[in-house]
Amino acid sequence: MESETLTAKATITTTTLPSHDETKTESTEFEKNQKRYQDLISTFPHEKGWRPKEPLIEYGGYWWLPSLLEGCIHAQEFFQARPSDFLVCSYPKTGTTWLKALTFAIANRSRFDDSSNPLLKRNPHEFVPYIEIDFPFFPEVDVLKDKGNTLFSTHIPYELLPDSVVKSGCKMVYIWREPKDTFISMWTFLHKERTELGPVSNLEESFDMFCRGLSGYGPYLNHILAYWKAYQENPDRILFLKYETMRADPLPYVKSLAEFMGHGFTAEEEEKGVVEKVVNLCSFETLKNLEANKGEKDREDRPGVYANSAYFRKGKVGDWSNYLTPEMAARIDGLMEEKFKGTGLLEHGK
């Protein structure tokens, strides 16, 4: 099955790709191709998903929610990365919102003072658009119309990234998180979705599906490993970070991220505490307590299926212990040990 879906990718990515500065991304472009995407997706294997009316579709060795797969195919076909672009790559619920805030604050620190930074009034997701969500479904958001924007994000597995991303030479940062906490964060997050597709499966059933790789963009461990291997082959193009180590001591990692992005902090900035200011501005505690991220407030640029507050639950390391039994924890730990054995991944970031 995997070879068939990878062949499908090859078939749909032969289009001549324009620069995303020049791409006509009106909603009609996605809409006129959407039926073709849906017809293609209807031929792929599917399984029961975490909601009764939302199946998971197999494509390229990974599992997808139908709408996100449509967006992925559209990005593969039409998104054209430039060498100057920078992508925040991740699996869902692994620190994406935090990393988006950091990359935006680092890249734009000379444009705003402490009181005028847009992060104080708007959600970080508004400034670093997803190439498989915002680009196809919401092409009119202001950040996509800004030709000077170079920050983008994606949950797309490395093997299925648009060819232009891989070939352009643009840089990427990938963040991963301990799988047990990732699962709990995802399961609780899905309960906050505004949807008519039915309730989320109970904890035990959802956990079993997660362990079997049946989750959006899953299997999660494969997702991590693919980016890890790409990082090992291209350390000058990919920065590989772990959520837990960054949370424990963010300053050195933020400095490394800035240097990697080409926006390194000067000695004068370090003396003035600019690094600390960026870390504090983007901290979980700061962002969660901003008015823009409270209650049922939505992002300003487009409709959202989640309120802004949904992206800020606890941000704690080890919260899984409040939900999972020792047997469940042992199961996922065993899967991780088996998958990552001999790769050097478990030792990275310790």
Swiss-Prot record:
Cite the entry's keywords alphabetically.
Acetylation, Cytoplasm, Transferase
Active site residues per record: 155 (proton acceptor)
Reaction catalysed by this chain? Answer: an aliphatic (Z)-desulfo-glucosinolate + 3'-phosphoadenylyl sulfate = a (Z)-omega-(methylsulfanyl)-N-sulfo-alkylhydroximate S-glucoside + adenosine 3',5'-bisphosphate + H(+)
Q: How is its activity regulated?
A: Inhibited by phosphoadenosine 5'-phosphate (PAP).
Where, by residue number, does 3'-phosphoadenylyl sulfate bind?
A: 93-98, 177, 185, 243, 313-315
Pfam families per the UniProt record, alphabetical? Sulfotransfer_1
Cellular component, GO annotation: cytoplasm
Tell me the residues on which N-acetylmethionine occurs. Answer: 1
Keyword Cytoplasm present in the record's keywords: the answer is: yes
Functional description taken from the UniProt entry: Sulfotransferase that utilizes 3'-phospho-5'-adenylyl sulfate (PAPS) as sulfonate donor to catalyze the sulfate conjugation of desulfo-glucosinolates (dsGSs), the final step in the biosynthesis of the glucosinolate core structure. Preferred substrate are the long-chain desulfo-glucosinolates, 7-methylthioheptyl and 8-methylthiooctyl, derived from methionine.
Q: Which family does the record claim for this protein?
A: Belongs to the sulfotransferase 1 family.
Name-wise, this protein is Cytosolic sulfotransferase 18
Q: Which organism is it from?
A: Arabidopsis thaliana (Mouse-ear cress)
